[in-house]
Amino acid sequence: MQPTNTQDPQYYHRVVDCQWACPAHTNVPEYIRLIADGKYTESYMLNRESNVFPGILGRTCDRPCEPACRRTRVEDEPVAICRLKRVAADLRGDVDHLLPKAPESKNGKRIALIGSGPASLTVANDLVPLGYECVIFEALPKAGGLMRSNIPSFRLPVRVLEEEIDMILDMGVEIRYDHRIESLKEMLGSGEFDSIFIGTGAPKGKELDIEGRQEADANVHIGIDWLESIHFGHIDSVGERVLVIGVGNTAMDCCRSSLRLGGNDIKVMARKSRQYFKASPWELEDAEDEQIEILVNHSPQKFVMENGRLTGMIFDLVEWDEDENGRLVSKKLGEKFIEADDVILAIGQDNAFPWIERDIGIEFGDWDMPVVDRATFMTTREGVFVGGDAAWGPENIIWAVEHGHQAAISIHQYCQDESVTDRLPYGMNLVSTKMGLHEWRYSNDYDPNLRTEMRYEDLEARLADIFVEAELGFDLKESVREVERCLNCDIQTDFTTNLCIECDACIDVCPTHCLTMTHNGEEEEVRQRLTAVAENTEQALFASEALPQTARIMFKDEDLCVHCGLCAERCPTAAWDMMQFDLLIPYAGQEPWPTTAPTASTTSA
């Protein structure tokens, strides 16, 4: 194996599993340490730099960071990263003086943002401080896109939503409400804008084209449209017996909303078994805690009407197996009629671009979607960019935020006549955490410590009012207990080869057997003869230069390390140190890092 290039920021970044998994690369360990220090405002602002909406995401994020959390190396449950984000948002002080501001003089460039969801708002957040005039076109009477229209208030209070949206709009963003764009060609032809960003989401709910659908139309609702109608006050009740078709997160929002609008017999109907559900595990748990019944292996076949009124649906009872090609095939076992007063369809979302003409230089590809470059977010027409769900279909808010950041970089470079593909690389700062010979300015308790359970509003109280937030959030005591579970994965081992005397002390003290000194070889073979076989090939092996006495190599399995620092504490020659890694993330208008190399390294005793 070749020695590991520790000058590459991606080496350290990959080891901070939570930050690596986050689409926006939020510095999770640092914001958790700030919470531990009671610095809630600083934690909030660190969050906001990358994910823009800490209060919103602290309640609604799909949490890609948590399955990656290194805490699961020592026990079953990850750190409650998402809920700690909410702690920072709930307990922060005033941040108005800390928010980015628009300069007094503009740069003369005008940007159109179609849609006011998280992607468009992020673009505005990044470009307005650079002097751009951003104009948002929103078809609805309020901003937020699907964050507003599709996430119920019992999960995301309107107060939290509007507070964080207003932080961006109050920079001086112009927004034109109730303004649906009917023709992109017309907008392009007006010459009013130097660049256009399309962030219209995936606004079209999928239909269920089966027998009786048209006849039952009055009592069959498209999930995302139904949730929007609830938010804007057009729907305030539902029938007692409700069937929700689908098992994604929208389906969970629909069934829980039905309970709060008068339904008392709510069933979620799934075509397949639980292992194929698309809903997040915690969304399923919340629904089932509210006594929602989920029926599996029920395939909808027919809406049943009597005397012009919907009475229920007929389902095929099925079982699933794989064919010779490994594809799932169903076998019908029978039929079942289930009563219903209302049916809500939550089986997916589609994009809709009837307003983008096909003769303006924008190519369309699979699923009638615009062809969008995955690095620059530009379409095949220069100056027109797409992000969020509008780019490649439905994803979570955090993905839309990252799309917005990347699109803002491209828009800025396009408007400054720079190449949109010439992007600043990530950088890093490395700072030693050493305070004394064997002391470090962080603590790391890798002993088992169970995840803190979320407290909920009383069931009767929350079901009585759709505006009552279900989750109460962590109190101070719970927050303290949960932050202690973080393993500080951004504080990483740093090895100096020429200081090593090959005494094996670090290997002896390592609690996870992640260190081995042995002769070199091909990686696949080396992985098999380490102290603990390194089976997870998605995590790198650290390989040192040849050691001075025996020419052996110090190997470290990054998958097993819990960042405890015992190797550095035990080492008699300081060959091991613990360095805090800070990923430098380029945003729109970012000046080059203060070094010609891709890293900026700082060491502090």
Residue ranges and their predicted role:
Residues 216-240, 323-394:
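FAD-site-proximal beta/loop scaffold in flavoenzymes
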Residues 133-136, 140-176, 228, 255-302, ...:
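Rossmann-like dinucleotide-binding cores of NAD(P)H-dependent redox enzymes
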Residues 254, 390-415:
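A conserved FAD-binding loop/helix module that cradles the flavin
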Residues 105, 110-114, 162-210, 302-314, ...:
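Feature captures the FAD/FMN-dependent oxidoreductase FAD-binding
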Residues 3-8, 85-107, 147-148, 152-166, ...:
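Flanking helices and flexible, charged tails adjoining ferredoxin-like Fe-S electron-transfer domains
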Residues 88-104, 163-180, 205-261, 364-380, ...:
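Glycine-rich dinucleotide-binding loop and its adjacent helix/turn
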Residues 12-37, 58-86, 135, 173, ...:
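Iron-sulfur cluster-binding cysteine motifs and their immediate structural context
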Residues 110-135, 250-259:
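N-terminal Rossmann-like FAD-binding beta1-loop-alpha1 element of flavoenzymes
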